[in-house]
A protein has these predicted regions:
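Single-stranded nucleic acid-binding surfaces, predominantly the OB-fold ssDNA-binding core
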Residues: 1-121
Length: 121
């Protein structure tokens, strides 16, 4: 199971690109706080459904999965690990609680199996 939830701050402006396929791609750099400092996490969102209006310094929550891409660079073979977003939200979004609950249920089903999950009250 590969589910990622990030909460952090945009460290640069979102970059919008139109791919040759006609699909839109938005990339973000999200800085997350760690116990021993901070980490910058690249995020890619393909065909965004409802991208939030965000700018450098804004807090965001990203729900998605981790992917490692391999490609050729001038120096030879290279790779990049990034989070592929299914959703990017502002932390105050009303949709956030519902999406986090859905993610938690998906994780629980993957860990304990669907037959063992008690029904929601």
């Amino acid at each position: 199971m590969n589910i990622t939830v990030l909460h952090g701050t945009l460290s640069s402006e979102p970059k919008h690109r139109l791919l040759p396929s006609g699909d839109e791609l938005i990339t973000y750099e999200v800085t997350t706080e760690l116990a021993d400092g901070a980490a910058s996490v690249p995020v890619a969102w393909l065909r965004p459904s409802r991208p939030p209006a965000v700018a450098t310094g804004d807090a965001v929550v990203v729900i998605g999965h981790v992917r490692r891409r391999f490609f050729r660079a001038a120096s030879g073979a290279a790779s990049r690990t990034e989070v592929v977003a299914s959703t990017v939200l502002k932390p105050d979004s009303r949709r956030l609680a519902r999406l986090l609950n859905t993610s938690a249920e998906t994780i629980q089903r993957g860990v304990v199996g669907p037959a063992q999950i008690p029904p929601a009250a």
